[in-house]
Amino acid sequence: MVVGKIIKISGPVVVAEGMKGSQMFEVVKVGNEGLTGEIIQLTEDEAIIQVYEETAGIKPGEGVTGTGAPLSVELGPGMLKAMYDGIQRPLNEIENATDSIYIPRGVSVPSISRVIKWDFEPTAAVGDEVITGDVIGTVQETASIVHKIMIPFGVSGKIKEIKSGSFTVEETVAVVETADGEKEIQMMQKWPVRKPRPSKGKQAPVIPLITGQRVEDTFFGLAKGGASAIPGPFGSGKTVTQHQLAKWSDVDVVVYIGCGERGNEMTEVIEEFPHLDDIKTGNKLMDRTVLIANTSNMPVAAREASVYTGITIAEYFRDQGLGVLLTADSTSRWAEAMREISGRLEEMPGEEGYPAYLSSKLAQFYERAGRVECLGSENKQGFVCIVGAVSPPGGDFSEPVTSNTLRIVKVFWALDANLARRRHFPAINWLTSYSLYIDDIAGWWQQNTAADWRSLRDEAMSLLQKEAELQEIVQLVGPDALPDRERVILEIARMLREDFLQQDAYHEVDSYCSPIKQYHMLKIIMTFYKKGLDAVAKGADPAGISAVTVKGDIARMKYLVEEEFVNTKVPEIINKMESELGALIK
């Protein structure tokens, strides 16, 4: 064990001497209070340490003790429904242990309870040959999730002993006879946060992640295993969009990282999620959620740790064959923490003061997303989707964090303050957003909705772009000066915006829209477009088309329950549309 001495303190950065024998990224205990820190630079016998707790009050001459291990997370039953800080300290347990609403410095509480006993059901038997990643038993962790206990990395052999019953995470549930001797298997394992968990290989992103948000699913779809960025200025709805994704996404587990954002936003999640039901299982949303709260008033160094802690937990659930959504709100705050620490280290600054390695750090994080074939002899597949919010100052998408993020991710949901001011939510700008997964996921949509899904989607997108071009003319000469065909295009684009893209996150029905309902809504609007053009070509007045009463039915379809809408209302609206538009033809 290496014991050094503090020689310099600069905010969250501490320099210690006498650290020869230490390793990069080793966790150390700093000062008399034993603050948790991590070595980020080694020079001869000096170590530069970033401290994950407030450094006020420590002074040169105090000791620094190495632990001999990198920053790691504990993985096992008990993580779901938990709320951690950036270095996986359980906030509820800290409050119970210290009777304080603040985190005392140097406090050390196990990340996973060592007291709770879990009912372990073995799925393997004595004599079975097992390899890394094989499931040997299960634990019903919450009503929604069956936690699979896996053989840890680097262990393979024959099961000599396996137990059944109630155990804590530290008790031995199985013994495996390996080439190096007997290995005891517990329900908990540790993993260094900076090291991606291995898999057999990545798979093509061909299945869409259904979020229930029409603009995201139909126009700018994210594939399972994909990465997406949500940049937007203040007040444009980043957090509500991420809450919607966490509530409704077609995943098994959600890891929500509040990275440097307001504490109130985490409070909203804690208050809301326990009362919301998961549409897949009917159980509470909190049963499938892990929260990592690293709010803006917590030490900046822990922001980086919170992002890596979150992705490691997500990869662990992925290795069980589950689908995981990781939302990070906001990666800009992590980048600002990097900038602050880089400045303390007196490194050469890059663009806008951010460190030169900003893009490689972002890439290391986003590249840990993916749909993979999991380790083990069974055919397990899991995925991690990453959705990172970006908060560009003043909504400037050319700033370094946004521009570097866009080089890495394949889906860009651009939030627009002007749309938010016009009360258009979700405020995703359909002209600047894009998805590079559309070609990959179109096959799934055509198979699960209808063969004309892609053509409808592309035609609707081109109408919205055409509307943007026509708006410049309309502002100069007014809509009445346009040809009849283009007046119909303006009306249909308005219907697409207001009746399809707009979605009420707080409405009981409209908060979530299934793929089938999305398809039929789009189909009705595009059918109205085609029939409207036919009517105009045969002499109908565009003003009359704008005044038909069926438009009211189209506007209300988003609030109808799916079964009623698809089975009864769709044919009714189509029939009414044909009769009303037919009556306009002279």
UniProtKB/Swiss-Prot annotation:
GO CC annotations on file: plasma membrane; proton-transporting two-sector ATPase complex, catalytic domain
A GO molecular-function annotation: proton-transporting ATPase activity, rotational mechanism
Keyword Transport: yes
Stored CDD domains: ATP-synt_V_A-type_alpha_C (cd18111), ATP-synt_V_A-type_alpha_N (cd18119), V_A-ATPase_A (cd01134)
Keywords: ATP synthesis, ATP-binding, Cell membrane, Hydrogen ion transport, Ion transport, Membrane, Nucleotide-binding, Translocase, Transport
Binding site for ATP: G232, P233, F234, G235, S236, G237, K238, T239
Pfam families in alphabetical order: ATP-synt_ab, ATP-synt_ab_N, ATP-synt_ab_Xtn, ATP-synt_VA_C
Chain segments annotated as coiled-coil in the UniProt record: none
InterPro entries per the UniProt record, alphabetical: ATP-synt_VA_C (IPR055190), ATP-synth_a_Xtn (IPR031686), ATP_synth_asu-like_sf (IPR023366), ATP_synth_asu_arc (IPR005726), ATPase_a/bsu_AS (IPR020003), ATPase_F1/V1/A1_a/bsu_N (IPR004100), ATPase_F1/V1/A1_a/bsu_N_sf (IPR036121), ATPase_F1/V1/A1_a/bsu_nucl-bd (IPR000194)
Superkingdom of origin: Archaea
Catalytic activity entry: ATP + H2O + 4 H(+)(in) = ADP + phosphate + 5 H(+)(out)
GO biological process terms held by the UniProt record: proton motive force-driven plasma membrane ATP synthesis
Record's subcellular location: Cell membrane
Enzyme Commission number(s) from the entry: 7.1.2.2
Membrane topology category: Peripheral membrane protein
Enzyme class: translocase
Subunit structure, interactors included: Has multiple subunits with at least A(3), B(3), C, D, E, F, H, I and proteolipid K(x).
PANTHER family tied to this protein: H(+)-TRANSPORTING TWO-SECTOR ATPASE, V-TYPE PROTON ATPASE CATALYTIC SUBUNIT A
Family: Belongs to the ATPase alpha/beta chains family.
Function comment: Component of the A-type ATP synthase that produces ATP from ADP in the presence of a proton gradient across the membrane. The A chain is the catalytic subunit.
Record's protein name: A-type ATP synthase subunit A
Taxonomic source organism: Methanococcus maripaludis (strain C7 / ATCC BAA-1331)
